[in-house]
Amino acid sequence: MNFGKVLTAMVTPFDKHEEIDFQALDHLIDHLINNGSDGLVVAGTTGESPTLTHEERIKLFEYVVKKVNGAVPVIAGTGSNYTKASIELTKEVAKTGVDGVMLVAPYYNKPSQDSMYEHFKVIAESTELPVMLYNVPGRTGVDMDVSTVVRLSQIDNIVSIKDASGNLEKMTNIIRLTDDNFSVYSGEDSLTLPALAIGADGIVSVSSHIIGNDMQEMIQRFEQGQVAEAANIHQRVLPVMQEMFANPSPVPVKTALNLQSVPVGKVRLPLIELTDEQLQNLQSVLSDFEHSKMI
């Protein structure tokens, strides 16, 4: 199932009291839809899901669905390392009108491949919503094998994967061994163009908050056979992509949005704001990028 080319893993705006800032969220959604986002992934890693309560997640999903009003797909992060909790949240989320759910591989428990298969299988069987798997071993401590993904892809409503392993060989084999209607998205911004070259469907991106239109142009150039032009854009946007992960995400991207007059507030603990030196580095990268667009 194809949700679009550039899906933005959306940040969650907070006010000065660290409550969800729905006015800022309204502005952010407009900004993203108007600047290259084909879809929104809500309450994922970038949305600070570990520090959101159950009630906050539901309110977030309800608001985004109502605001978007069908303009782009909305995918809700309902994954957990507790299978029963993920099932319960997924069932409740289905009532909000989201277009799909994203399920992260169980973290901390370090399950086996067979355990992960059973975990995803029972959650998928509990809902009619399309399911996107999320493999992010750098955060979860477990890496989904190709064979596990292929087995799961045979379940009717498991339709996609966001793979943030950074392993293009693995991604290639997933693409090769799954049906054409099973979509594969890179979860690594810097691998957007290489992933397209091996047959991926697109990117679930953090950097698209800042450079969504540039990423769309890069993808369009590639699809039109203008590979050199796409590579030039890739080289130009790469420093921005790298800077978005130079410090724990979503600290850099939230800071960048605030700098660009898209207010999203600060992060919740245990994350903290950038140091003065880190902020200067971010500002320098953004300034250099803007200058490069004028050359």
UniProtKB/Swiss-Prot annotation:
Biological role: Catalyzes the condensation of (S)-aspartate-beta-semialdehyde [(S)-ASA] and pyruvate to 4-hydroxy-tetrahydrodipicolinate (HTPA).
Similarity section: Belongs to the DapA family.
Keywords tagged on the record: Amino-acid biosynthesis, Cytoplasm, Diaminopimelate biosynthesis, Lyase, Lysine biosynthesis, Schiff base
PROSITE patterns for this protein: DHDPS_1, DHDPS_2
Pathway the protein acts in: Amino-acid biosynthesis; L-lysine biosynthesis via DAP pathway; (S)-tetrahydrodipicolinate from L-aspartate: step 3/4
Keyword Lyase set for record: yes
Assembly notes: Homotetramer; dimer of dimers.
Protein's organism: Oceanobacillus iheyensis (strain DSM 14371 / CIP 107618 / JCM 11309 / KCTC 3954 / HTE831)
Subcellular localization: Cytoplasm
Protein name per its UniProtKB record: 4-hydroxy-tetrahydrodipicolinate synthase
Segments forming a coiled coil: none
UniProt keyword annotation of ATP-binding present: no
Domain of life: Bacteria
